């Protein structure tokens, strides 16, 4: 859906988008539409088309999952969606420039900071919930306390801490699974997680995969 450039495939997806838009325009039962989860929707021609033509009405609410790099520019372009936004989830896997740009390839730390500051300023205008999604792994677990401090300052409603999963991206996923007891950084990781486990911003309190 996100990065498809094949002409025939795109035509098919635009037709599907048209059917979704038509359904949304005629439904008044109350719907929550999730936009994203398979890449950044603001980088997708199909998702942009869907958001451009999505209805601006109270019975249809939207939730967006994004990496946040394009969001400031897109908020005005798709005001019909943001006027009815229920939740904004931003994937942020680092709280410093070096870590963020190492993990989020192609990401620019200054741009994500600028965009998060913008959301912080306009969030109350749109009345949506704002979550950070943070995929915990070896290269970023030490920055969890910093991320929580940043979330507090910005007014983020919740921080979702999620373990890294094996998407066949790494040749040895075990070296990144810092929550496993046989990992060389486990003790340090466990100490950090215990220090933040009661933080009010942490949304998922099921830490069976994190704590002993």
Predicted segments — roles?
Residues 3-18, 26, 52, 59, ...:
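Radical SAM enzyme [4Fe-4S]-AdoMet core and its adjacent flexible, acidic
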Residues 21:
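Conserved alpha-helix/loop element of class I SAM-dependent methyltransferases that forms part
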Residues 25-33:
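LRR N-terminal entry segment and analogous cap-like coil->beta motifs
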């Amino acid at each position: 859906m996100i990065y498809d450039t094949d002409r025939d495939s795109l035509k098919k997806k635009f037709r599907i988008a048209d059917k979704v838009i038509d359904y949304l325009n005629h439904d008044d039962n109350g719907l929550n539409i999730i936009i994203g989860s398979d890449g950044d929707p603001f980088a997708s021609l199909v998702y942009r088309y869907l958001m451009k033509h999505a209805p601006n009405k109270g019975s249809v609410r939207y939730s967006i999952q994004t990496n946040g790099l394009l969001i400031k520019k897109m908020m005005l372009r798709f005001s019909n969606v943001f006027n009815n936004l229920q939740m904004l989830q931003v994937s942020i896997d680092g709280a410093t420039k070096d870590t963020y740009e190492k993990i989020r390839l192609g990401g620019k730390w200054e741009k994500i900071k600028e965009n998060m500051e913008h959301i912080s300023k306009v969030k109350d205008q749109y009345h949506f919930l704002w979550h950070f999604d943070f995929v915990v792994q070896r290269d970023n677990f030490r920055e969890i306390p910093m991320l929580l401090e940043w979330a507090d300052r910005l007014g983020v409603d919740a921080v979702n801490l999620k373990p890294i999963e094996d998407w066949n991206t790494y040749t040895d996923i075990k070296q990144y699974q810092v929550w496993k007891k046989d990992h060389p950084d486990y003790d340090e990781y466990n100490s950090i997680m215990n220090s933040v486990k009661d933080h009010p911003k942490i949304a998922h309190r099921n830490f069976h995969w994190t704590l002993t």
